[in-house]
Amino acid sequence: MDIFILALAILPVIVLLIYIYKQDKYEKEPVRMLALAFLLGILSIPLTLFLDGVIDVMIGGTSVFYVAFFQAGIPEEFAKWVLFMLVIWRNKNFDEFFDGIVYMSFIGLGFACVENIMYVFGEQELLSSL
């Protein structure tokens, strides 16, 4: 049963990764770089949790707006963007406008894959801060 649930959590990510890869019609990105981008999405989670803690200490709040915007949106997207800028931005393979969509999608899907797994296996405490 756990394998089936895990597959349900990961399958949408795999489908989207393949779809996005196929959309890059002119100059496909190296699979190694795409795997790195996916890994960066996974690695953005600790940075997200750190940023969430900093924002919570600095601002604090419990409203739906606060949680959605300051505890989820800003830390998550900023963490993904920072890793993109540090690792992918200056890479020689990043040479077309569409590459930004491809790489950021892979980063986002790396994050989403872990988030999906955490949702289906009930890691509520950690999830509440993502």
Language-model segments: residues:
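Hydrophobic alpha-helical segments at protein termini of multi-pass membrane proteins
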Residues: M1-L130
